[in-house]
UniProtKB/Swiss-Prot annotation:
Protein family (similarity comment): Belongs to the heat shock protein 90 family.
CDD domains in the record: HATPase_Hsp90-like (cd16927)
UniProt region (C), positions on chain: 562-634
A GO cellular component entry from the record: cytoplasm
UniProt-recorded name of the protein: Chaperone protein HtpG
Coiled coil start-end: none
An MF annotation (GO) of this entry: unfolded protein binding
Species name: Photobacterium profundum (strain SS9)
Length: 634
């Protein structure tokens, strides 16, 4: 506890605007789960203990002759206060202002833009964001924080006070002990947290697994029940959960530990706890979350596993142990092979790190594969939340490309819904006799994909096509040439050959029709010039007069859009214009003797094909003029 003398250097400061917004939303959105404030405060105390132990490896004087680190809870029913104290790393004045007056997270404004004023939805988002210390204001009308950083003089203590409104007060104090005391002045209707049994229940529920002892101040009574004094009593096991035998750990304990390491309110989808001995000696505890964090799509946001070395905390967000496409994984690695003075720089090119990364990646992919096979509904939840991120995998991790491909899910003409439930293995199991390729189509949306004219011949021949409508899909497929020995084939390519699924009579008729249509093709080429790479006849269409396609090695439409959206200069796509000789509009164009009118027909059909392929035209006015002039002749 703090010992305060004269209050000096006192100032009142305004909260960062995001803090005010978070406090307001949190108090209203999380009230139904208000007991989590104690979990958050004890979790912070545990982190402070971890940081002290780590820094004391190189600066043992930071222990100040007190290496027994722990958390203490005490309450005063008359005063209506609950105090959570720790003797961890503590804070100086700058730390207090930075950590208690602002939210030092990148993308904070983006996070708040996603809030909807729907309390149930916002509570999930706030839980993902991590409320930490601010959760105190769910139950407290005011909060005082007295703290001193380890290694600082007693007169370097700091006191921070706020009612959780627009501002806070910070001042210097004397504090003989290092660490932090958080004094909650509880609201009048929160007396339940001034009860020893209630506090014991909460600690048992949320904090049994942390690696430092939690003590509560209990009253001692004589034989007649009269109070004679008080003592500190430990109320948690204080053994790090991952060091215990798996058979002794309950499912509920694993879930609560996930909440502790991730600061996520939701339950994990699955987890894997492993002790490995041999060439490598380490323990890993990995979790797959059920909800994506608000900044999941930001590759630069902090992510990674907690790293311990010989049960000593080293760092949060150790990105070196998991590839970026698995950045949603949570948990920890405790290694006996890394040095205690390991730094992020040392981790970069360390052989032990590389071996641990390979093993943890394999473990994570195995967890996902097991979930996909054993619980399709749960895996679908995972895919909805994290599928976009997993699609980065084939480009990033060549050695595991086949495993990742097996975990991907897509829409398909087989089920004709936007739900991404079809695996590539599902598709392969339904391939027609003689089919050697996996056919796919990329588009801006599922609606655009399922209505694409490129699908007409596939539907007619009973061939399934994977429908891809996520922004990343074109890039994904450029990194995924095959699956199980079968090549992927984009159906928008000019050299697509489905002749093996046609009879000889049809082939002969098409050959004759193409020959008869040569002159029309040449006229169209002459009109369009270099606006297209080529003009050809096609017999793969049924209800559509024309399409545009690209050569096999030519950049496709979706890739060009992806590069443009990312700010890159993309070469212009060289389209091949394919016309259907059997369609009424094409026949009408072919019979047009007037070259000017013929040109308008070409503009009409090319414009339609470009709209179907790209969703837009470079020169809409030219297309509209051609349509209008043709309509005046009707």
């Amino acid at each position: 506890m703090s010992e305060q003398g004269t209050h000096i250097n006192k100032e009142t400061r305004g909260f960062q605007s995001e803090v005010k917004q978070l406090l307001h939303l949190m108090i209203h959105s999380l009230y139904s789960n208000k007991e989590i404030f104690l979990r958050e405060l004890i979790s912070n105390a545990s982190d402070a203990a971890d940081k002290l132990r780590f820094r004391a490896l190189s600066q043992p004087d930071l222990f100040e002759n007190d290496a027994d680190i722990g958390v203490k809870l005490s309450f005063n029913a008359e005063a209506g206060t609950l105090t959570v104290s720790d003797n961890g790393i503590g804070m100086n004045r700058d730390d207090v202002i930075e950590h208690l007056g602002t939210i030092a997270k990148s993308g904070t404004k983006d996070f708040f833009s996603k809030l909807s004023n729907d309390e149930s939805k916002d509570s999930q988002l706030i839980g993902q964001f991590g409320v930490g210390f601010y959760s105190s204001f769910i139950v407290a009308k005011s909060v005082t924080v007295n703290t001193r950083a380890a290694g600082e003089a007693a007169d370097k203590g700091v006191s921070w006070t706020s009612e959780g409104e627009g501002d806070y007060t910070v001042e210097d104090i004397n504090k003989t002990t290092r660490g932090t005391d958080i004094i909650l002045h509880l609201r009048d209707d929160e007396a339940e947290f001034l009860n020893e049994h209630r506090l014991r229940d909460i600690i048992g529920k949320y904090s049994d697994h942390i690696g430092i002892p939690v003590h509560i101040l209990v009253t001692e009574n004589d034989d007649e029940g009269k109070p004679t004094g008080s003592k500190w009593e430990q109320i948690n096991k204080a053994q790090a959960l991952w060091t215990r035998n798996k058979s002794e750990i309950t499912e509920e304990e694993y879930k609560e530990f996930y909440n502790h390491v991730s600061h996520d309110f939701a339950e994990p989808l699955t987890w894997s706890h492993n002790r490995v001995e041999g060439t490598q000696d380490y323990t890993s505890l990995l979790y797959v979350p059920s909800k994506a964090p608000w900044d999941m799509n930001n590759r630069d946001s902090k992510h990674g596993l907690k790293l311990y070395v010989q049960r000593v905390f080293i760092m949060d967000d150790a990105q070196q142990f998991m590839p970026s496409y698995l950045r949603f994984m949570r948990g920890l690695i405790d290694s006996n092979d890394l040095p205690l003075n390991v730094s992020r720089e040392i981790l970069q090119d360390n052989k032990v790190t590389q071996a641990l990364r390979k093993a943890s990646t394999k473990r994570a992919l195995t967890m996902l594969d097991r979930m996909a096979k054993n619980d399709a509904e749960k895996y679908q939840t995972f895919w909805t939340e994290f599928g976009q991120v997993l699609k980065e995998g084939p480009a990033e991790d060549f050695s595991n490309r086949e495993k990742i491909a097996n975990l991907l899910r897509f829409s398909s003409t087989h089920n004709d819904t936007a739900d991404q439930t079809v695996s590539v293995a599902d598709y392969v199991s339904r391939m027609k006799e003689g089919q050697e390729k996996i056919y796919f189509l990329t588009a801006d949306s599922f609606t655009a994909a399922k209505n694409s004219p490129h699908l007409e011949q596939f539907r007619a021949k009973g061939l399934e096509v994977i429908l891809m409508h996520d922004r990343i899909d074109e890039w994904l497929m450029s990194q995924l040439p095959e699956f199980d020995g079968k090549p992927f084939q984009a159906i928008t390519k000019a050299d697509l050959d489905l002749s093996k699924f046609e009879n000889e009579e049809d082939k002969e008729k098409q050959k004759e029709a193409a020959e008869e249509f040569k002159s029309v093709v040449e006229r169209a080429k002459g009109y369009l010039g270099t606006r297209v790479k080529d003009v050809r006849t096609t017999f793969k269409l049924h209800d559509t007069p024309a399409v545009v396609v690209t050569d096999e090695n030519e950049m496709g439409t979706q890739m060009a859009k992806l590069l443009a959206a990312a700010g890159h200069d993309a070469p212009e796509v060289q389209y091949i214009f394919e016309i259907n000789p059997e369609h009424g509009l094409v026949k009408q164009m072919a019979n047009e003797a007037d070259e000017e009118t013929f040109g308008r027909w070409v503009e009409l059909l090319l414009g339609q094909a470009m709209l179907a392929e790209r969703g837009s035209l470079e020169d809409p006015s030219q297309y509209v003029a051609a349509v209008n002039k043709l309509l005046t002749k009707v």
